[in-house]
Structures are given as structure tokens and as C-alpha cells.
């Protein structure tokens, strides 16, 4: 824990940040609130990540209480003292730049991991094992994973994630040391209660006085927000001119699925380390932030725009927030009737039902939370198996979930709370990235597969497989639009990761395979509001957004970006387009 007096640390950190901001004008967050975890390493004389020695990094920065993460893409805000890594991301520089304030000290700590862990694991899972781009690696999160299976994941990677294999870099002793480390208990209870949540909240003082019309000339409903994972920024993109409107520093390791208010004015961003940020798209400012958990999956916005639901891996909670100022409404512990706690896989808005839906990772239940009912009652639907990675029909009456153990899909009627069908889906279907359209007069859904080289098309009346379309490798994302005859799917994994397939929704035949940037990962398609243009990410640190004509399939423009991942069009998102995820 921090052993220095607060005033001393305040002085040290203030001097450091004053010097840095004096030399680096771009330092700091939007709206005048400066965050110590938003430095841009590209602006510093710092060796490439592969040339760094983690011990030297610790020695160099421990005096200032600052430690770089191993991959160099993020300034990890930690205080390194006496063998303990303590999160101090609560240290904030106030809008006037004159004060430091301890907003919400995090008592959650974990034993400092080995140098091996720091070198290979910390950049995704956090130096303190509390999670980042990857999940927390703690006994409470690993209860369903045997140590032998954990060793296999370390050696072989995991196809449903971006977890790479380390088998060629590690011997058996190294692997076992890492396994024992991640199953070791933290030094203190990992809690994030109402006091911590309330104390973390940050508001822009004049947010209520901001104008209620855009400060730019673009169509506000044809904007995109593009998460640039390479340097933790977000770009606001004009979908008509296909040019950036604004770029700002974000919290660390944002979840790519940005959510919007029903009118499209506000965007809500969730970081993997629990921060929820409210961004005013009209005024291009962060207007509120709160830390709702330690390791967060995602956020959902109610259909009336008044309430947010945050799903956490750590602690095992659902957190309801007031959308206006991100004030805490309620913490819902995730525990079943037998007392078994569970991580939250994801939360979803089900606007036609006036509810949120939560997918649970560790218990065979799906929870529905009524946001338009007093007290936010929770309905717990018991399932036969744990289901993950949800897809919904357009009416949100039917839920389709993946059973990762049985390698199948289940269709659950949310009205009756019963299973009505089982889908023969082998491999690892990525239902959460599925899309729907009308095929020969009836609704069908299509899903990519994270393990097998195919796209599966399913009849949504009898739930039979209509067609399996071969691809050049496992895929992650699918997209389409009401105004296009085509569906697009990537090949995210394997040697053909640079391929992008386009197939005809009427014939279910492959039309074209694009290679946007040979040798580099192409992924995550999104359409403009009218479906005229298609945006494709080159998912690399020196990447780009590639703009295609949706009719001719010809490239028309490239916009350089730093590992662009999730990108969502405001109009398509708030109108629940059948061609995009909700």
C-alpha cells in the first residue's frame, strides 16, 4: 500500500505532470480533465517494447510512482513500493490544473508477479493480475478452469480470444510457475463497493451549460466512434465526408462496443479496468466518468436513455448507474440460489422488453433486469447449461446462446423462460457477432465461427442449418446493412487473417474475397448510415480504416489509425440495424 504521506505524493506527481504537460501539449483527457494513465508513449524518447528490460523500467520509474507497461502502449499508473503494486488511477489532476485529489483509493492489491509474468502477461492482464484487455487472473475468476487446462491455454492459446500461444517460448517449469502464480490468492480482498464507486465519480463542472447542438457541421447520426486500441484513443469520424472530426485520449483498454443514448447525443465507453465514460458527441467532450468495477466486461444503455447497466468480472456484480451523471443507483451481487457467485459475460439492452439482459459465465442462468419497474427487479431464468455470447431476434423475444461445453446453441423464449430449440453448431460459433436478414421470405441468422472455417446460416423458424459457407479460416465479425445485397465476414485467425469475404445474401454464394492489406489483419466491418460505404479495420498498430464502395466493392479511401478495433455508426446502432450488433 502507499506508505508516503498524501501531500508528499501529491507534490511529486504534480511536479512530474507539470513538467510533462509543459513539454507535451497533447497530454491529458478531453474536457480539461487530465488523467495520468493517458500519456502517449509515442511522444517520449523511449526504446521499442522488444528492447526494454522490465527490471530497468521498474527501477527507473519507481521513485516517481510511475511504471510503464511491458508493451509500451500504455502508461500503467501504479505505485511501486516494497513489493506491492497498488493501483493509483484514482489520482486525478483537476480541471484547473492546480490540484491533485485522491478520488477513490483502490484497496485491491495482488502480489507482485514474477518477471516472466510481467514480460508476457501484464500488458493484457494487468501487472496486478486485476485484468486489462484480458480478464483478471485470480482464483475467483479461474474457479471453472482446472490448472491443467490453464497450462494448456498458456501453451496453446485460446481460439475464442486474442490469447496467443506461448508454448514455443516457455518450458514446462515456466508454464507451471505461471499457473501457480495465477491461482495464488491476492494480498487483500478484492472489493469495489458503493463507497469506492461514489468516490471515483468525476463530473465536468459546466456540462449542463453545454449547447444542445453540434459544434461541427457533420450529420450527428452518421458519425462513427472508432476505438484505436494501439494508443488508447477514440476517433470521431464523419460518415459523409469520411474524415475525422475529433480524436481524444480514452481510458485504458476500452471495450470496442461503444453504446449511444437513444437520441445519439451521448456515447458511453467502458474500459476493461472498470471505468465508464460519458462522452458528449455534440460538444466533443468527456462530461462524466465513474469506476464501476475492477474488471468490467461492457455497458448497456436503457431504451429510454435514463439508466446504464455495467457487467463486471471482478467483483461479481451488476451495477446500475444514472445515465445523466453516472451516479450509482444500485449494486446487484451476482449469485444463484445455491450461493454460487458468477462473473458477468456481457450485458445487453432489450428495448422492446423494457429490460436489460445479463449473460452469466459461471452459473446456468440468464438474468433479466426491468429498468422501467420500481426497484429494478431481477428475473432469474434457469437454464440447462451455462450459455454465453448471446444473439437476439429483432423483437428480443428469443435469445440464442452458445453452449461452449456441448458445442451447440440453445434458443430460449424469454417470455416463457423455456428452451424451445437446440442448434447443431459445432466448433465455436460467435453468436454475438451474428446478423439477420430475409432469405426467401423468412428470417435467417448467420454466425461466424471462432474455431472452424465457415459461416453458418440458420432458419429462424425451424432452427435448422440452411447452409455452411466455407471460409479461409475462423472469423470474428460479420456485418451487413438493409441497403446492401452483401454480407461481409473477416478471417481473424490464422494465415489468412488478411482476407475479407463478401457473400450474396440472396444466393448464399461467395462473391469476392478481398485482401485489403496483404499480411495484415483485416477485421470488423461497419456500414455508413445509408449503407453506401463500408469501413474495414486494418487491425495493426500502424493500421488504417479502409473505405469501400458497398456496391462495387472497390476501395476508395484509407484513413491512417493506430490499431482501429471497434467502430460503430450512431444511426445504425440506435436503430438496431439487423446488419450490426446491438
Residue ranges and their predicted role:
Residues 243-248, 285-290, 327-338, 375-382, ...:
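A short beta-strand motif characteristic of beta-propeller blades
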Residues 474-543:
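Loop/turn-rich, solvent-exposed surfaces of beta-rich toroidal or solenoidal domains
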Residues 104-111, 118-120, 164-230:
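Flexible coil segments in periplasmic/lumen-exposed cytochrome c-class electron-transfer proteins
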Residues 295-307, 311-364, 375-378:
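Asp-box/WD-like beta-propeller blade repeats and closely related beta-sheet repeat scaffolds
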Residues 63-64, 212-213, 254-259, 296-301, ...:
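Repeated scaffold domains used in trafficking and secretory/extracellular systems
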Residues 94, 239-241, 281-284, 323-326, ...:
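Short loop/turn segments that connect beta-strands within beta-propeller blades
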